[in-house]
């Protein structure tokens, strides 16, 4: 029932704001699934626009002084993961397929010392009215313009111009979206 879901989310998010992340702001009619896992650092700033929705399991983790901005009308399908240690901005009316993973951070590593538990953070921007299909991975340094489609299974890092369709079949290709 939608009303119960909205009430549950308002109570849960208000609780997080009072006792954890004072930088949490959220709009009206938040429809997040009960299986949402929120790990918000007290020093982070998190903004959820109106009618942000998730179906099924989802995980959101923020680090100290990180910024996560999710616009109004954004939808996340089952299994989405957001790890924000730097800055992630998602434009309004963007849709995410199942299993999408968004990481604005990466472990430090070197040939001499191997992998460290320390992380480096960057930025990710996803424009308005995009469709990010199933099992896409967005890495730090990603900048996706408005009205883009990112095909299933793509790993994205770097700039994707507005109005682009990105697909993967052996090699990743980027081309303008054709009007049909």
Q: What would you call each of these model-derived segments?
A:
Residues 2-3:
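Short, small-residue-biased leader/transition segments that mark boundaries at the very start
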